[in-house]
Amino acid sequence: MPKQVIIPPGTTAPIAPFVPGTLADGVVYVSGTLPFDKQNNVVHIGDPKAQTRHVLETIRSVIETAGGSMADVTFNSIFITDWTNYAAINEVYAEFFPGDKPARFCIQCGLVKPDALVEIASVAHIGTPT
């Protein structure tokens, strides 16, 4: 099955040469997602919970556009700028994954926009369409 580009309705062009997600062989690959508004500005500056919620809602929209749900997520790559935000980010993260949790890693690093506190990339196995 060829790769399919996934762009949720109302999504604006990314600030770099990539797409929000791709679907191949029943697997959705969601690009690293930052807390951006439709003009690619960072939202909820200084609020790690609100930024995490915004990021995960954006990821959910990509996965749902591909035909899946957050329950299909099998792996997350999480990048944070400050370990002091780790508990707040995990609190919101747990709301989006209430049952069996996906595998993940979390590292502290700099992000492409100074006001962004969190970035998440996801992989979801949604199966093949029938």
From Swiss-Prot:
- Could you cite one Gene Ontology molecular function of this protein? deaminase activity
What Gene3D superfamilies does UniProt report for this protein, alphabetically? Answer: RutC-like (3.30.1330.40)
Q: Does the keyword Lipid metabolism apply?
A: no
EC number(s) stated in the UniProt entry for this protein: 3.5.-.-
According to UniProt, the reaction catalysed is:
(Z)-3-aminoacrylate + H2O + H(+) = 3-oxopropanoate + NH4(+)
Q: What is a biological process (GO) this protein takes part in?
A: nitrogen utilization
Q: GO CC annotation: what is one?
A: cytosol
Enumerate the InterPro entries for this protein.
RidA_CS, RutC, RutC-like_sf, YjgF/YER057c/UK114
SUPFAM superfamilies attached to this UniProt entry: YjgF-like
| Top-level taxon in the UniProt lineage | Bacteria
Function, as annotated, reads:
Involved in pyrimidine catabolism. Catalyzes the deamination of 3-aminoacrylate to malonic semialdehyde, a reaction that can also occur spontaneously. RutC may facilitate the reaction and modulate the metabolic fitness, rather than catalyzing essential functions.
Q: Which NCBIfam families match?
A: RutC
Family, according to the entry, reads as follows: Belongs to the RutC family.
Query: What protein is this chain from?
Result: 3-aminoacrylate deaminase RutC
Q: What is the lineage of its organism?
A: Bacteria, Pseudomonadati, Pseudomonadota, Gammaproteobacteria, Enterobacterales
